């Protein structure tokens, strides 16, 4: 999906407010693919600055790779202590995307009282964010539902947070 079109549809059904209320109540939210991208502050998809939900600082930009879109299986590099990747830290997951966030939101936030996001990385032309875990908000750039046994385990891991 396109970032701007997704944000437009989310706004039509007041989803930004609903997501914010859910997170404020500590209830888990999982974003997948463009669902992860819209959690960032903005996207420059198609050369137009689009505002996202702003849950994390940073911009979603076009991948800098010889082959775009990135379609296929890639190894991910989760941080130690990851809940989502428990038992699947050395697995490949299925990606299909042309845009991604590349700046660690924890670095953009800097030190302070907020709980810093844990970032999982992957590489396609350059490093990009493959997943983020941040309290009750989790998101993946890849499709766990298309990622076989590893994706099923990741979803089971997320379900333990409910």
Predicted regions located by residue number:
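Cysteine-nucleophile active-site neighborhood
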Residues: 1-72
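Amide-donor transfer/coupling interface in amidating biosynthetic enzymes
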Residues: 24, 58-162
């Amino acid at each position: 999906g396109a970032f701007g079109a997704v944000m437009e549809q989310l706004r039509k059904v007041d989803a930004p407010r609903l997501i914010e209320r859910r997170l404020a109540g500590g209830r888990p939210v999982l974003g997948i693919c463009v669902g992860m991208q819209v959690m960032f502050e903005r996207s420059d998809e198609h050369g137009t600055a689009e505002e996202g939900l702003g849950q994390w600082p940073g911009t979603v930009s076009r991948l800098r790779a010889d082959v775009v879109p990135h379609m296929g299986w890639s190894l991910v590099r989760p941080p130690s202590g990851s809940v989502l990747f428990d038992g699947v830290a050395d697995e490949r997951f299925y990606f299909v995307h042309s845009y991604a966030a590349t700046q660690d939101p924890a670095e953009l936030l800097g030190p302070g009282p907020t709980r810093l996001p844990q970032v999982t990385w992957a590489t396609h032309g350059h490093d990009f964010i493959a997943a983020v875990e941040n309290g009750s908000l989790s998101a993946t750039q890849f499709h766990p539902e298309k990622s076989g046994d590893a994706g099923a385990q990741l979803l089971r891991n997320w379900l333990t947070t409910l």
